């Protein structure tokens, strides 16, 4: 039997969830306090149904994903309602970008809190692969495994995180955004130039690799030296992190030493570099068409 998904909130993200899970063959019920919005979201895919109430939306659901306004009090109020109507075993997920999962879960009875977690998708959620599965302090293993299974079966790249401000993506992304604005304020470059440099340099690499893999290619000792130089100019926000200093102190500098953030055999290094260059050449050709 196909999994049942309840989507609460039929805005941009909720409508994307309908497309995502319907395309995976799941049964979808979507509810919104605006009936027309729920109907419009459901009409995107055959088999999706606009529910007339929360009770109807959650009937038999394996997973409920909330996608309402990004404010704590409305989310807490909704989760109190969800806790009253959700079937036993239904995982209650909040699609928050930065709010505390623990704070949202605090609104429901203690017996329900093990079923509450975060699922931070990225817009458009039916296209962008990653989902941050955020485990609150009271989230149970079963809820995490259920969410991971349903998300991965739908083709998502789902990773488990602890409940921390900004999670991973926004903590890193917004640090970059803030620094880009500082470059603009300081007169270093125009907005157009900054975007061109980012999208054509480390942004280009980030399509295929995360910051740790890129760091291992570039050399962690190089990162340390550059960070020290930047810290002398811009202050403590660029100070090398302790974990990076410890790696460099042990001579674990990345691909060139066979160990950095990750471990590498000599054979793996050869294949990694070959594969990296192949990917970048293909990306460069695609970028020319944009």
Predicted regions and their residues:
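NAD(P)+-binding Rossmann beta1-loop-alpha1 motif at the extreme N-terminus of oxidoreductases
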Residues: 1-47
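C-terminal regulatory/interaction module of P-loop NTP-utilizing enzymes
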Residues: 182-190
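Rossmann-like NAD(P)-binding element
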Residues: 33-36, 47-92, 99
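Rossmann-fold dinucleotide-binding core
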Residues: 91-163, 170-171
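Structural/interface elements that position substrates and couple domains in central-metabolism enzymes
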Residues: 35-38, 173, 177
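NAD(P)-dependent Rossmann-like dehydrogenase/reductase catalytic/cofactor-binding core
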Residues: 3, 24-26, 153-156, 162, ...
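Structural motif
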Residues: 8, 31, 51, 67, ...
